[in-house]
């Protein structure tokens, strides 16, 4: 019995060791090194971004598009960056997974855009967007992460969250649409909007500033808090609630 227990322990140990190299899906697992490199990628002609790996993103508006990636020297080469039909795609190579607990040197993406109308992120990302002026902007977030958008100026703003993500946004938008499924949150008390439509299913929450008209629907235990004195047309089922925070 003792011999059998020792053999079992050895087998389990070998399996655990192998899990550091390969995931249960058969993908190769890379543990980031402690050597940091920086690499400029040749990108141009895009107004949309699709990000599906992990890391920190610093995004700003400027006259010249650019992309810089810094991070572990064994991870940066595994990141694909390509522009397809105006969409900048940033992803990990196929059959590759990155150990998110590898070290204290995360991937960092510094992106300069001339214009941005769509930003989609899936996976785990920490995004910092600086002041942005654009006719319309759609932000779609799935998975876990945080997006901070400072001082956006746009006619139409569309925010969508599925999962545990959070979006903080300030600035001005003529119209805003917010769609949250899961436990995501939108924090926008400093985003002045004329009209807003909010749809929440699950435990999501949103804080807004609306001047003219607010419409919305909550199914589940979600909540919407708003500044301003807009006309309202809202409905909720379950424990959902709409709450006025008074004038701004």
Can you say where each PLM-predicted feature lies in the sequence?
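Intrinsically disordered, low-complexity terminal regions
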Residues: 1-248
